[in-house]
């Protein structure tokens, strides 16, 4: 009888886990679809609801940050920009508490800083440029074979080199290496970040052009 009760409990627990996983997959897929359709607010809100239900999973928190960061590039309304980047910073900080020393989250943190500098380089560049260099160096030390880390650091270094009138050739080689890493990089985590390859290809074309 005891064995039977244990078996029933295990089956019920397994069923609940599978249902939860299925809900997570459906929710994340829907949020990704909304994002792809350009429905930024709806996508962000859905990622946020998923994140609050997945307290030990850094990935939905990451996407709240990423959606709000990427939509901030080119934004002219300072109030909207501040609202989006503050939310991005809040959620990437939570994700970093869940998954410390995560290179993907470090890259996302640097992207938030870059969005501020893209908005007002004179104001934010002196404050955030050095921080970004430190962040990318840390990310590369943690994950030298991660293509997003290699590409993002190379892109950052290339931009800095152009600004100071220095040779960008070494960083073009890093972009090429990133593309090689993209070809083989895999993760078993569902919805693990996968962006960067197309951006790296465009960056490499500029190097050769």
Sequence positions of predicted segments:
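Terminal, low-structured helical/coil segments at or just beyond the last alpha-helical repeat
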Residues: 169-209
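Start-of-domain marker
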Residues: 21-69, 76
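TPR/TPR-like (Sel1-like) alpha-helical repeat modules
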Residues: 83-90, 126-137, 147, 165-186
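Short coil/turn linking the two alpha-helices of tandem helical-hairpin repeats
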Residues: 70-79, 110, 115-124, 159-165, ...
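Bacterial Sec-dependent N-terminal signal peptides
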Residues: 1-27
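Structural register within alpha-helical repeat arrays
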Residues: 30, 64, 71, 109, ...
């Amino acid at each position: 009888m005891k064995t039977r009760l244990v078996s029933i409990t295990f089956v019920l627990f397994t069923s609940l886990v599978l249902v939860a996983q299925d809900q997570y997959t459906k929710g994340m897929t829907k949020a990704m679809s909304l994002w792809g359709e350009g429905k930024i607010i709806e996508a962000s809100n859905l990622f946020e609801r998923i994140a609050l239900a997945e307290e030990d999973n850094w990935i939905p928190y990451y996407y709240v940050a990423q959606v709000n960061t990427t939509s901030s590039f080119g934004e002219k309304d300072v109030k909207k920009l501040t609202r989006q980047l503050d939310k991005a910073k809040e959620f990437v900080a939570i994700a970093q508490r869940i998954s410390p020393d995560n290179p993907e989250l470090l890259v996302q943190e640097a992207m938030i800083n870059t969005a501020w500098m893209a908005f007002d380089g004179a104001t934010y560049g002196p404050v955030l440029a050095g921080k970004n260099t430190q962040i990318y160096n840390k990310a590369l030390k943690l994950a030298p074979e991660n293509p997003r880390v290699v590409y993002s650091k190379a892109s950052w270094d290339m931009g800095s080199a152009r600004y100071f009138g220095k040779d960008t050739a070494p960083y073009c080689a890093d972009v090429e290496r990133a593309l090689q890493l993209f070809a083989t990089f895999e993760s078993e985590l569902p919805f693990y970040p996968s962006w960067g390859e197309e951006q790296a290809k465009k960056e490499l074309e500029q190097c050769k052009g």
